[in-house]
Amino acid sequence: MDTMQAKSTLPSKLVWSLVAIIGAISFGMLALSRGEHVNAVWLVLAAACVYSIAYRFYSLFIATKVFELNPRRLTPAHRLADGLDYVPTNKYVLFGHHFAAIAGAGPLVGPILAAQMGFLPGTIWLLVGVVLAGAVQDFLVLFISTRRDGRSLGEMAKQELGPFAGIVVMLGALGVMIIILAVLALVVVKALAHSPWGVFSIAATIPIALFMGVYMRFIRPGRIAEVSIIGFVLMMLAIVYGGHVAADPYWGEFFTLTGTQLTWCLIIYGFIASVLPVWLLLAPRDYLSTFLKIGVILGLAVGIVIALPDLKMPAVTHFIDGTGPVFSGSLFPFLFITIACGAISGFHALVSSGTTPKLVDNEVNIRMIGYGGMLMESFVGIMAMICATVLDPGVYFAINAPAAVLGTTVESAAEAVRNLGFVVTPEMLTVLAQEVGESSILSRTGGAPTFAIGMAHIISEIFNSRAMMAFWYHFAILFEALFILTAVDAGTRACRFMVQDMVGIVIPAVKSSGSFFGNLLGTAVAVGGWGFFVYQGVIDPLGGVNSLWPLFGVGNQMLASMALILGTVILFKMKKEKYV
């Protein structure tokens, strides 16, 4: 615990005072603009200052005063080490694995959809929500699960709240988890369908991760930096070579898969990944994916500082009354339901009580992994908000409004957008579609295309050329697919643990991580559940993302409330009620 205590010197006080002043100025620029375009760099600075202050002071207070983290306390990864699920893991590798697991579709898609209300409401919730709720929940659940041998959320609820409450939480969490995984997987399917470049590059990360797992465990143990460089280089080569694969007549057709084919591939992959030892595929693949995730997000932030794009969307639009075309619902509660993971997410509680606590090497690492990981995800949400709001509002609504509102031609879409109170011309929509290499950008709902176009727009402004718009657009689509797929990996494994815990009430032997039958049963229920919903969404587009996303948002927040209730009860039992 002493290692976390930071000395407050005069230079340190001056630095943090400067950070606070910069943050205050940035918020002032965002909040006090009078109908003028605000530069996106103020949003980046405001977020960076909030995250820095929250991590330096608030998370340290929680770690030392509330949780009293002890570096000398043996973690379950050491006491129960089995080489399968309980494996002491380097804190940077585990941070990568945990971040990759929690950062799915939510922080990318949610803020983009919420941008129809303006950039300010969503930004405030992304920052305030994560500091006071989301990061605290992740930190809390990871802490209490690590102190309880890595038990799942449902099992801890049964232990702390009683058998009936525990079973209710287990069943509710399992149902919500299946819906969440279905939404995540469906977004991946929509992004990769008929995209040989994306399919090849995503598929290539599997053998690369297997190689990294074997390399770190048997060939060069402990050489984290070395294997990281190798894995990153191989992944970049896979992405670059994917363009050549897509252009090849034979291999391009081979890797061109329909939505149904991709669904079955994901089901098979999810089953295999969940039963393999965590060190072999899951941890190295998530760690590998994190390089791309964090690298792209930080690179995008630097790009915003260089390009200095303006936020074209108003701070607040008239759609806060619930009449918006992107999603129906007023500011409260639909803004919070829609943004979901970027501020607080119940899904994180399942990951923080599923795979991650079984891998913690030292208890003091929980602060960086739990609180820090969630701050990083919120920053992803901020980047998504910027990508949506740097676009002309007319273009934003042309991409995100459904076909029932826009029609099927650029002329009808331009007229529909004008009726919404914004201006866009058919020529603008046609030229933009050509620049990103698509036949049309109309009604490309789901958030992913908007993020990709916004990212391509920002990068093009850096180089003052739109010649590479198509490349950056498809790179961003690939990035989003990889971003989301890693959450499906870890979520399926966490779902397996939940099934084993429930069946273990009747058959105790099934609960053991060494039970091969329990592993197969839990995995089959997990992938069968979310696979069914994904398949239905693929064959019936009306029952896809548009229907599942509201269920995802509501269920996600409900699960977060369960986790916070459980955490509150445990803090009371620890005699920490004065901090609640």
Regions found by a protein language model. Give the residues of each.
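Membrane-interface helix-loop-helix modules in multi-pass membrane proteins
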Residues: 28-34, 85-148, 159-163, 179-194, ...
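Extracellular loop-to-transmembrane helix junctions
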Residues: 37-56, 60, 114-144, 154, ...
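Transmembrane helix-loop junctions in multi-pass membrane proteins
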Residues: 25-37, 108, 120, 178-194, ...
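Membrane-interface "cap" regions at the ends of multi-pass membrane proteins
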Residues: 2-22, 53-108, 290, 330, ...
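Loop-to-transmembrane helix boundary motifs in multi-pass membrane proteins
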Residues: 160-178, 370-379, 445-447, 465-476, ...
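Selective recognition of specific alpha-helical transmembrane segments in multi-pass small-molecule
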Residues: 49-59, 173, 178-180, 234-238, ...
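Extracellular/periplasmic helix-exit of transmembrane alpha-helices
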Residues: 304-320, 375-454, 490, 535-543
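Flexible loop linkers connecting adjacent transmembrane helices
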Residues: 2, 60-87, 113, 127, ...
